[in-house]
Each structure stands twice: as C-alpha cells, then as structure tokens.
Amino acid sequence: MRIEVESLTEAGKPFAHTYRPEEIALDEEEHARLTGPATVQGSARRRGEEIRLRGKIGAEVEVSCDRCLAAVRLPLEVEFDTAFIPQAAEAVKTENVELLSADMGLAAYEDDAVDLDELVREQILLALPSRRLCREECKGLCPVCGADLNAGECACEPGGTDPRWSALADWKDKSRKS
C-alpha cells in the first residue's frame, strides 16, 4: 500500500489495509510466516517534508519452537510511530557519523509516496519474541537421535559424552590426581 504525500495535511488522514499472507514475505531464516490476513490501520500526517505514520498492526505469525521445532502460532498486536523524510534529505543526514536519538525512528520515502508494505513487514519481525517456545516446559529434541522428548523418552543412553571431549576428560582426571 502506498500513501501519496501530496494528499496529506497536518490534520492527518486515516488509512487502513488488509494484507493477504502471500503479500508479506517474512524472513525465511526466521522460519516465520503469516497464517492469516494482517491488518494495519492508523493515521498519516504531513509537516513540511516529514510524514508521520502512527497506527496498529494485527497479525498471526507461525514460527518454529526453538527447542523442538514444532509449529507455534503467535498472535501479534504491534503499535508503531514512524517518521519518514524524503530519500534526498536522508542522504544529507547520513553524512554525520553520530546518530541522534531523534533520528532513531526515521525512515525514507521516495517518489512522493510512502510504501507501507516494508514498514508492516519490519514491525511484524521486530515484534517476534527472541525466544520462541511451544510451551515453557518444552523438553526439545534428543541431541543423539533427534526424537521429540515431549512425546516421550527415547532409547538413547543418558549421560553419554561426545568422544571428541575425551582428551579433556583425561586431562581433568589427571589434574585431580596430582
């Protein structure tokens, strides 16, 4: 969705859009995808060349559990407040090395329109928790055979150590005896 800069005033103009899951490609490395429509609504204001967007995004995202890789659905409600400046003005600002706190919420627009799609995608990804678990007591996968330990115990011997660590274990035993 594009918001035309020329149509905006200081009083503000409301906007709303519903994205289909295939319209927003989330990060494949994050193993995240939309499971249904994502809605965005808010208002856009213009003060000089600066455009300020404030609003809310609602979506449901499916991610993989960090321990057992099971699919986990996360409902997200994200509020945003972002200022946009023209691409040319942003190029002038980036000549300074120091980033001021006032510049932290700045993004750039070009061609006299603000592209809302990338903002929505970024805000959804930023709202994802850093630790994604199917449940707090998730046992994860067996490091030897890969069995899901939530479904039951596997046949692997507990306490087995990797043979690559045997030299360190020998050194530890020798240092205890000395």
Features from the language model and the residues they span:
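Structured interface patches
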Residues: 1-178
